[in-house]
């Protein structure tokens, strides 16, 4: 490669290096988040999941914040010039870039105005998937499964809100867990789909490569979502895997997290109050 070519492609090489570093960091953070409960359970004052303690809840909840910061770091690296601006301490430029990034992300996640007709079109698929998930759970509960597959006596997430008032329980099951889990699980899928749908991607990336990348992200998301529900038994993992497929279809069908959050929230609320 000649000196001229090196100079010409240097910004792209730097950008690729920043993105690679960001994704590597995110992978490491996801790995740490995966083993964090085991590490936290060995610390003084922390009890295993299923026996709640304030310190345990605080430490075990920190893993989600760490992964969220890692995801934000990766997204920041994806914008041209952001890393360089940050390194040079250009706070004003960084704020402008961050605003652009934020708007791009929320647009990719489906943050837009919805008409009553739009919401009405979501009712049947959302309600249908809730019914399907309840039937899947009923089917799994009656299969002759081994000891490791039987349903747990207590769901740690429900134990947390056992002594709460009905409105608090409803808000927790309808908003807190669904929003957090959908942003972490289906959010990356929608963001990748958004990037692959840009004119730049259509000009630069072959169609089959775009499909492979999207399906790979979907597979990782489904497996991760199912793995995050492995706190109790294999039946819960299988149920979460089925749910992840349906939630992914909803998110991609409407290019929005809203129907997935609604389906996830109403399902959680139904299970909690049934």
Per-region residue spans from a language model:
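Alpha-helical transmembrane segments
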Residues: 14-30, 124-129, 218-223
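Juxtamembrane helix-loop-helix connectors linking adjacent transmembrane helices
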Residues: 40-58, 83-178, 194-208
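Alpha-helical transmembrane segments of multi-pass membrane proteins
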Residues: 24-41, 76-77, 133-138
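Alpha-helical transmembrane segments of polytopic membrane proteins
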Residues: 56-68
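Short helix-terminus and kink motifs of transmembrane alpha helices
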Residues: 33-41, 85, 186-191, 236
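Transmembrane helix-loop-helix hairpins at the membrane interface
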Residues: 161-274
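Hydrophobic cores of alpha-helical transmembrane segments in multi-pass inner/ER membrane proteins
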Residues: 66-77, 257-259
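Short, Lys/Arg-rich, polar N-terminal cytosolic tail immediately upstream
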Residues: 1-11
């Amino acid at each position: 490669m000649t000196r001229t070519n090196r100079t010409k492609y240097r910004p792209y090489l730097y950008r690729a290096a920043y993105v690679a570093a960001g994704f590597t960091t995110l992978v490491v953070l996801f790995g740490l988040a995966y083993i964090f409960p085991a590490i936290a359970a060995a610390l003084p004052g922390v009890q295993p999941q299923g026996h709640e303690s304030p310190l345990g809840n605080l430490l075990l909840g920190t893993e989600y914040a760490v992964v969220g910061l890692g995801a934000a770091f990766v997204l920041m690296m994806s914008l041209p010039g952001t890393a360089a601006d940050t390194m040079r301490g250009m706070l004003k430029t960084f704020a402008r870039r961050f605003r652009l990034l934020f708007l791009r992300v929320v647009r990719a996640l489906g943050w837009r105005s919805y008409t009553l007709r739009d919401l009405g079109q979501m009712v049947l698929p959302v309600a249908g998937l809730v019914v399907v998930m309840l039937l899947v759970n009923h089917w799994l509960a009656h299969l002759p499964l081994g000891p490791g597959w039987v349903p747990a006596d207590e769901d740690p997430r429900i134990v947390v809100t056992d002594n709460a008032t009905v409105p608090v329980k409803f808000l927790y099951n309808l908003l807190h867990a669904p929003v957090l889990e959908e942003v972490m699980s289906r959010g990356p899928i929608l963001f990748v789909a958004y990037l692959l749908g840009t004119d730049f991607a259509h000009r630069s990336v072959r169609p089959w490569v775009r499909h492979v990348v999207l399906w790979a992200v979907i597979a990782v998301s489904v497996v991760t979502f199912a793995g995050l529900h492995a706190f109790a038994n294999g039946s819960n993992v299988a149920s979460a895997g089925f749910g992840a497929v349906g939630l992914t279809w909803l998110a991609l069908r409407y290019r929005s997290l809203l129907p997935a959050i609604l389906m996830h929230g109403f399902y959680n609320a139904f299970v909690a109050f049934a």
